[in-house]
Structures are given as structure tokens and as C-alpha cells.
Design a protein with these regions (language model features):
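Metal-cofactor-binding active-site regions of metalloenzymes
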Residues: 2-36, 42-305, 354-368, 375-484
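C-terminal amphipathic alpha-helical interaction region
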Residues: 309-311
Length: 484
């Protein structure tokens, strides 16, 4: 295997080899590439931006927190400990703490990422963010590490400086219902030029069969500064926190479920399940019923407060029990499951889907549901939008399949634009650039086949890259963080 060469970084990368399509794609992309980034859903840590401290090292920035990287390396037999992932039990063998060793292990296995979106994103990061032109491999690992480490010590590579450099107009974090929002208040007064907003995610409070639910409820009661003894107390406290999140700039809620079942029960039945949870005797079926009821309740509250409701369905989290018990969640062990939406969402959509005050954005890991169920529903109900390709599908071919399978049925403007959904801060511009290239290529093919003209393609390209996300998340009604 050749080592030490210059990274191939063609200007027409990811475009179709057909010269007609490529020409159109390049022209469309040239009009979208420099648009500001709107990141309406993601997992960047607000505390990192508030503190604005230098990143520690290349390994802790790029490798250890990225579950896309962890899953593929683990699949090749690379121990997670060797990548800096600490076991939950102190008695277990310790994780590697030398960032150079972690980076070398990553570089030794860089070949595993060929033709994956992770390779595309990190190639972009190395070249465009850090200015590194040599190919990453075993032989160049130290050189690349040293170059990144040197840059990370400069003021230009602190989080807020990168935020400006990345041209991020809006960045939404995802926050627990008990979050103090202190970091967001700090950022709101920092005059960053970027609007940084929280997202309300109450999932842990809805999982009443979880052994940690009691502790979550206590933390939530502390955050709301009120006793929560009944189901009505609970719902009122949720509404209070939603209002506090909205006052801090939130535009959306987020709800992760395996099955998107929606069914309203009586308040008396909901109270019985809540009391069972407080006694620690709620079953998995109790939790399923409680979650399905609370999705209905969250939709009702969204009608009233205007927060956009996001539902992420079809991911069986922590599929690998051994990895979950040893290392905890978000280690790359989430797996798609076949997911039914037509019947499961019908109660919610019949109750609220015709109300233009309500907005529901649905994401799935079940690709087969795009054309079979979600695009037809998004193409009918005024309140519903189809979310961007997610997790396994925000890839070159995955995003192209999404466009081909949904546009003819839902129409472009019933989709919610792109979101990067990432914890990997430095990958944000890479992910948006890849999406803009894929969308330009999709549109270029439509122009080449005379389905649309170049004027339509330019307008659609801008919608896909920028306008749809702002519209979907109701981001057009306020200025940037720090504006008076």
C-alpha cells in the first residue's frame, strides 16, 4: 500500500462521471457551497462553546467521541479501550490515555473507512479545516497528529473561532429536560454572530420502566423547583420546562422511540402508570403505553407553544449488550429495525396533523419506509415534514436514494432540509458540504434528463442547502445569538 501521498481531493468529487450531469452539478454547487450553515439538530456540547478552551488533542477531538469511527473499528476487532473509551467499572482494564497511541491505532486502520461517509468527512476536515494535504496512514500518523496538535493550540482553532470560520448561522444542541440551560444563557450574551439554541429532549422522563427513571424524576423536580407527585404535576412541569427552553431560544423538541406508536389514554390511566413508575413496578408494556400517550401530549403542547416536534424512530439502541454494560450508550451499537408508521402515527396525525400551528418532522433508520409510508404522509398532512437521511443514511448513496425515493411523492418542500445530527464539531462543515454536493448532483441529473430547467435547479439547490431547514424549524423570526 502506498503511503505518504497527497490526499486525492478532486473539485468534482462525488459528482456523476457523466460530463453533462457533472457540468450542471458543478454549476448548482457553486451557488450553494458558500451559503451559511443552518444546523437545526445536533449534539455539540454547549459547555464546550461556552468555555471556549483549546481542544486537548486530535484523538479526543476526532476519534474517541465519534461513534461512526468506533463502530467500524470495533467491527475489525479493535478494542474500544484502545481508542480511549473508558469502561464504566473502575475494576475493568483502563482505557488508553495516550492520545498519540489512540491516533496511531486509528491511522493504522484508516483503510477500513474507504468509500464510507466517515472517510469523506475526515478527508474534508484534514484538508479544509486543518490544511493537511498528505494522506493519513500508518506512516504519516505522527506527522498528521503533530500538525493538528500545533493548530489546536492557536486562537484560530478555539471553538468559537471555528464557529465563525465554519460560517454557522444557527446551531441547535440537544439537551435533557433537566438541563439548567446555564451554558445557553452564557452563549446568548456572548455576541457570537451565531445563534446557538437548545432543544428539549425529555426521553429519559418517558421511559418509566428504566431503573434510572426515579433518579431522572428527582433531577427533573429539582430543575423545575416544584414537587412532582402526580401525573398532572408531571405534565405541568414538562410544560413549564418547555416554556423555559423556548425562552432560552429553543425551536424544537426531540423524541427518540423504537416504535412510533401514538395513542392517547385517559388521564386516570396515565396517572396509574405514573404511580406504578414511582413505586418501581412499571413494566415494559406500561412504558410503551406511557410513551405513546406522551407523544400525543407533546403534540398537543406543540400546538400551543409552537415548538417543532421531532421524532426519531426505528433505531434499536445499544444492540450489543456487552458493549452497553461495559461502556454505556453511544458507542456505535445502534441498529435499524423495520418500522411501521402509517398506523402508528395515524392517531397523532388525525388529532393534530391538519392543524397548521403544529409541525412534526419524522426521521427513520428504516429506509424502506421513506417511499412506502413517510413520503406519502408528508405529501398529504399540512403539519408533517420528512426529516433528512439519518445515521446510516447520511452517506453519498444514502442521501441520493432519499431524494430519488421521496421527491416524486412528497415534493421537495415537504422535506425539512439537511441537518448534520453530530457530536463531531469539526465535521459540521464537511457534512454540509457533502450534502450540498450530493443534492447538486441529484439536481444536475434532473436537468440533464430535462425533468427541470436550470432555473428551477438553482432555486431547489438553495432550498435544500439553506432555506428548507430555516423554514422547517421556524428559524426565520429572530436574529443571531447576542442580538438585542
Amino acid at each position: 500500500m502506498e503511503t505518504g501521498g497527497v490526499t486525492e481531493f478532486h473539485e468534482d468529487r462525488y459528482f456523476d462521471p457523466d460530463p453533462t450531469i457533472r457540468k450542471h452539478a458543478r454549476e448548482i454547487y457553486d451557488e450553494t457551497r458558500a451559503l451559511p450553515i443552518v444546523s437545526p439538530h445536533g449534539h455539540v456540547d454547549a459547555a464546550m462553546l461556552a468555555a471556549n478552551e483549546p481542544f486537548a488533542d486530535p484523538a479526543s477531538l476526532i476519534v474517541t467521541p465519534d461513534h461512526y469511527i468506533l463502530r467500524l473499528l470495533y467491527s475489525a476487532g479493535v478494542p474500544l479501550e484502545s481508542l480511549g473509551v473508558a469502561p464504566l467499572e473502575s475494576a475493568a482494564p483502563a482505557a488508553e490515555t495516550d492520545p498519540r497511541s489512540i491516533w496511531q491505532r486509528f491511522a493504522d486502520n484508516w483503510h477500513l473507512f474507504r468509500a464510507t461517509p466517515t472517510r469523506a468527512w475526515i478527508d474534508y476536515e484534514l484538508r479544509e479545516v486543518f490544511g493537511i494535504k498528505c494522506q493519513l496512514d500508518s506512516a504519516t500518523a505522527t506527522t498528521v497528529y503533530d500538525a493538528i496538535a500545533e493548530r489546536l493550540q492557536s486562537a484560530e482553532f478555539r471553538p468559537r473561532a471555528l464557529l465563525r470560520r465554519f460560517n454557522i448561522e444557527v446551531l441547535a444542541t440537544t439537551d435533557s429536560a433537566s438541563d439548567s440551560l446555564e451554558q445557553h444563557h452564557t452563549l446568548r450574551n456572548a455576541n457570537l454572530g451565531t445563534r446557538i439554541i437548545p432543544t428539549f429532549r425529555p426521553d429519559a422522563l418517558f421511559r418509566i420502566a428504566s431503573p434510572t427513571w426515579g433518579a431522572e424524576l428527582k433531577e427533573f423536580a429539582k430543575a423545575t423547583n416544584r414537587p412532582i407527585r402526580t401525573y398532572r404535576d408531571f405534565i405541568d412541569a414538562v410544560a413549564q420546562r418547555r416554556a423555559e427552553f423556548k425562552a432560552a431560544g429553543a425551536k424544537a423538541t426531540d423524541h427518540a422511540v423504537v416504535v412510533p406508536r401514538t395513542e392517547r389514554m385517559s388521564e386516570a390511566d396515565a396517572h396509574r402508570l405514573f404511580l406504578a413508575a414511582t413505586r418501581g413496578v412499571a413494566t415494559d408494556e406500561d412504558q410503551a403505553r406511557f410513551e405513546s400517550h406522551l407523544l400525543m401530549e407533546m403534540a398537543a403542547q406543540s400546538v400551543e407553544d409552537g415548538l417543532v416536534m421531532q421524532v426519531h424512530a426505528g433505531a434499536l439502541r445499544n444492540h450489543n449488550d456487552i458493549v452497553y454494560r461495559r461502556f454505556g450508550p453511544d458507542r456505535g451499537a445502534d441498529v435499524p429495525v423495520a418500522t411501521e408508521f402509517t398506523r402508528n402515527l395515524r392517531p397523532l396525525l388525525n388529532a393534530y396533523g391538519n392543524d397548521v400551528r403544529f409541525r412534526l418532522i419524522v426521521f427513520t433508520l428504516d429506509e424502506s419506509a421513506y417511499s412506502r409510508e413517510l413520503a406519502p404522509m408528508a405529501g398529504h398532512y399540512p403539519a408533517m415534514l420528512l426529516g433528512a437521511p439519518w445515521w446510516f443514511h447520511d452517506s453519498i448513496e444514502g442521501m441520493m436514494r432519499f431524494r430519488r425515493e421521496t421527491t416524486e411523492t412528497a415534493g421537495l418542500e415537504n422535506t425539512a432540509g439537511f441537518n448534520d445530527d453530530t457530536r463531531a464539531f469539526c465535521s459540521i462543515p464537511a457534512r454540509h458540504d457533502l450534502a450540498r454536493r450530493v443534492d447538486a448532483n441529484y439536481l444536475g441529473a434532473l436537468v440533464g434528463r430535462h425533468v427541470i430547467g436550470m432555473g428551477d435547479a438553482r432555486e431547489m439547490g438553495r432550498l435544500m442547502a439553506y432555506d428548507l431547514a430555516k423554514r422547517a424549524y421556524r428559524l426565520t423570526d429572530a436574529g443571531t445569538t447576542g442580538d438585542k
